[in-house]
From Swiss-Prot:
Keywords: Endoplasmic reticulum, Membrane, Signal, Transmembrane, Transmembrane helix. One of its GO terms (biological process) is protein insertion into ER membrane by stop-transfer membrane-anchor sequence. It comes from Macaca fascicularis. Part of the endoplasmic reticulum membrane protein complex (EMC) that enables the energy-independent insertion into endoplasmic reticulum membranes of newly synthesized membrane proteins. Preferentially accommodates proteins with transmembrane domains that are weakly hydrophobic or contain destabilizing features such as charged and aromatic residues. Involved in the cotranslational insertion of multi-pass membrane proteins in which stop-transfer membrane-anchor sequences become ER membrane spanning helices. Residues 219-235 have a biased composition (Low complexity). This is Endoplasmic reticulum membrane protein complex subunit 7. GO terms for molecular function: carbohydrate binding. PANTHER family: ER MEMBRANE PROTEIN COMPLEX SUBUNIT 7 (PTHR13605:SF4).
Amino acid sequence: MAAALWGFFPVLLLLLLSGDVQSSEVPGAAAEGSGGSGVGIGDRFKIEGRAVVPGVKPQDWISAARVLVDGEEHVGFLKTDGSFVVHDIPSGSYVVEVVSPAYRFDPVRVDITSKGKMRARYVNHIKTSEVVRLPYPLQMKSSGPPSYFIKRESWGWTDFLMNPMVMMMVLPLLIFVLLPKVVNTSDPDMRREMEQSMNMLNSNHELPDVSEFMTRLFSSKSSGKSSSGSSKTGKSGAGKRR
């Protein structure tokens, strides 16, 4: 009897030890399984559309064109008919643009809801609150070839005349020529005021006196008028004497 009990005791000890080992391994396995199930994969969608260049066949330009979604986060390619499909895109707001070295396309913003509903609108960087809806699937039309260079301006006479140095030389000359014709030079008070104002401007004594120049200019014209008047009166008097 005692021998049987001593033979059963090691078996019981082994059973107890194996139960402890299994109980210690189960929480670790449960923890590992809960961590893997916490990482979820959301739904993915696709953006569809068509790019068109008026008057040009798609085969002539689609080989060098690409469809970019948010820069280069998602890249798509054009089919032979100009259509495109960009797959594996999660819900959110994206800027879709067709990039081509020969033609320019305006970018379009596409909003994708969690249920897969699409909404397209123009990209307006100036008025961000302004929303202009576009049809979906996208219909992207080229606005013409891109302008990589600025056209050089041609030279014209207006550029020469509007030069500040030319204006500084021409305007004083026009003033000296046109002012005596506009102002009544026979009025001595007006002449005196003009001479005083010109003397105030002529502060440098090394320069010629402007008032003296104006006096000579006006006196020459007045003397010419007086001489012409006297000659006319002389001729009329001689005619009367005859």
